[in-house]
Amino acid sequence: LESRMRRALAQGEFVVYYQPQVDIVTGAVTGCEALVRWNDPVKGLVSPAEFIPLAEDTGLIVPLGEWVLRTACAQASSWSQAGQPPLTVSVNLSGRQLQQPRFVQQVADILGRTGLPASQLKLELTESTIMGRGEEAVAQLTDLRALGLSLAIDDFGTGYSSLAYLKRFPIDELKIDQGF
């Protein structure tokens, strides 16, 4: 599966679907979440539950995550240039991506190359991504927020689940897991 994933990344078999985020009061679409899917030429759509853990274990999540971020930013910028109202695009981050030494610069470069205003990008991470990294995580998240984007904790309640601890981090949104 790992060699197939490497080939899939090289040959463009991954696709991004956009799940709309709707204001329940007005019914207006306010944003979307970028969701990566693998369209294998033999198996068809491969479940993220099958390939994301392997991507994490092998480190392939870093180039895959960069591709998703670049693709989602380019698409959101394209929608704006086509006259659509500005939408916030949310992109999930892996802990491995966040640990890359040049990650903040990479995000800034992608925003610059795609022309997407940082205010239209929301990066989502899980609480386990930042827990235990303390001041290092605070500094990195602060640097990301300084770019002008927003940050969200996704699936809160599935891990450490300490609101007191989370107050230390520059987070804009907390998405509570349904099991919390």
Q: What residues fall within each predicted segment?
A:
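Conserved ATPase "switch" residues in P-loop NTPase domains
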Residues: L9, S80, R145
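Signal-transducing alpha-helical linker
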Residues: R4, A10-E13, E56, L60-G65, ...
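Conserved long alpha-helical elements within nucleotide-processing catalytic cores of c-di-GMP signaling
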Residues: A49-P53, V62, T142, A164
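Catalytic core of bacterial c-di-GMP phosphodiesterases, primarily the EAL and HD-GYP domains
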Residues: Y17, I24-E33, L60-A137
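The catalytic core of metal-dependent phosphodiesterases that act on cyclic dinucleotides
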Residues: Q105-F180
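Active-site core of bacterial EAL-family cyclic-dinucleotide phosphodiesterase domains
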Residues: L1-L54, N92, I153
